[in-house]
Amino acid sequence: MTAGATLPTAASAALFERARAVTPGGVNSPVRAFNAVGGTPRFIRSARGAWLTDADGNEYVDLICSWGPMLLGHAHPEVQAAVSAAVARGTSYGAPTEPEVELAEEIAARAPVERVRFVSSGTEATMSAIRLARGFTGRDVVVKFAGCYHGHVDSLLASAGSGLATFAVPGTPGVPESSTALTLVLPYNDRAAVEKAFAEHGDRIACLITEAAPGNMGVVPPDADGSGGGFNGFLAETCARHGALFVSDEVMTGFRASRQGQWGLDGAVEGWRPDLMTFGKVMGGGFPAAAFGGRADVMSRLAPEGPVYQAGTLSGNPIATTAGLATLRLATDDVYAHIGAAADTIKTAASDALSRAGVEHVVQAAGTMFSVFLTAGPVRDFADASRTDVAAYAAFFHAMLDQGVYLPPSAYEAWFLSSAHDDRAVQTVLDALPTAARAAAAAQT
């Protein structure tokens, strides 16, 4: 059944009830539960191209793309063929394979990294990068920004302390104070806060980690103005000046914001490089895969070459690396141009529809990924993002869902498209926007 104004949800609702009996909250990642928007989470049965089909047979244009990885759309035939051939050869060997070498070479050809180590999740990548930074520098303090998400690493699930440049407190039950006692949390895009933190703690700071363009509070681009380049360039220079490592988290933006990730939009232009980078999502082609990489002298500190320990049973497994390699080889400049054009069309139409409905909003982007904030802009940090009207977004979300468009079920996430989003898919989104904008207007708080 094609999605329409009133959608059946009985099958999804029944599956959700079964799931809640055996899984906390009925889901394996919290945002999937629809708690932020209400209603019945859709259980997806299949996906192809730009479209999802749920357990009730409803079809949706997918503007989540598995939270970023599906750059080429779902069930891309060439990726499927490569994966099928790899599966036929065996699924995991616990030994080195050629695909992991080829994928590392492909990543190093696009991103400014000299060595790459594979892991199985973005959380593992950031956790390992921080351990390596501490091992390399002999220091213990880590700096991060409020609103930037780096996976569920204990030391990074931190909330800002009771003053600027103070040490953090745990951001969730289950994280002891000792885990965040060496983490500084600063407001994003705030150069003065960064300078103050390094002035007070610079000789103890092992690294500063940031999302290259935050997407987990909605898309909040790094400030592009300022002498010597944008905010990321300023961070790179500040870290270098104080002997700390600059860790750029491109789990979301890597090979998604552009062919070279967010770095291709700022660092490649301004002439700076991170010391370490983390990757995930797109580089796994829809499979569990992530990586961290960087300067050869830093990466050489990893075991077995150096003393900093890191390992993983399924790290670099042949199925995930084959899928990632096939995806990156197919991700040409034309792919990014197509996605960018489709994203621009939707961004413009969303803004027009919301303006006509009288809904205060701002649309922000980092390359091909973007967010619609239902608040006055610009949104420069987590405090700004927190002002978005979540009730209005929930109404907007459900109006789009009822018309066959699957948006992130949270006001604080990025929207993603793929090369499979053709004219029909884009037009479906455009047709749904006016009704959704009016629903948002009616629900404004």
Swiss-Prot record:
One of its GO terms (molecular function) is transaminase activity. Pfam families: Aminotran_3. Homodimer. It is found in: Cytoplasm. The keyword Aminoacyl-tRNA synthetase does not apply. It is an enzyme of class 5 (isomerase). SUPFAM superfamilies: PLP-dependent transferases. It catalyses: (S)-4-amino-5-oxopentanoate = 5-aminolevulinate. One of its GO terms (cellular component) is cytoplasm. It comes from the Bacteria. This is Glutamate-1-semialdehyde 2,1-aminomutase. GO terms for biological process: protoporphyrinogen IX biosynthetic process. Its EC number is 5.4.3.8. The keyword Isomerase applies. Keywords: Cytoplasm, Isomerase, Porphyrin biosynthesis, Pyridoxal phosphate. It comes from Nocardioides sp. (strain ATCC BAA-499 / JS614). The modification N6-(pyridoxal phosphate)lysine is found at residue 281. Pathway: Porphyrin-containing compound metabolism; protoporphyrin-IX biosynthesis; 5-aminolevulinate from L-glutamyl-tRNA(Glu): step 2/2. Belongs to the class-III pyridoxal-phosphate-dependent aminotransferase family. HemL subfamily. Its cofactor is pyridoxal 5'-phosphate. The gene is hemL. InterPro entries: 4pyrrol_synth_GluAld_NH2Trfase (IPR004639), Aminotrans_3 (IPR005814), Aminotrans_3_PPA_site (IPR049704), PyrdxlP-dep_Trfase (IPR015424), PyrdxlP-dep_Trfase_major (IPR015421), PyrdxlP-dep_Trfase_small (IPR015422).
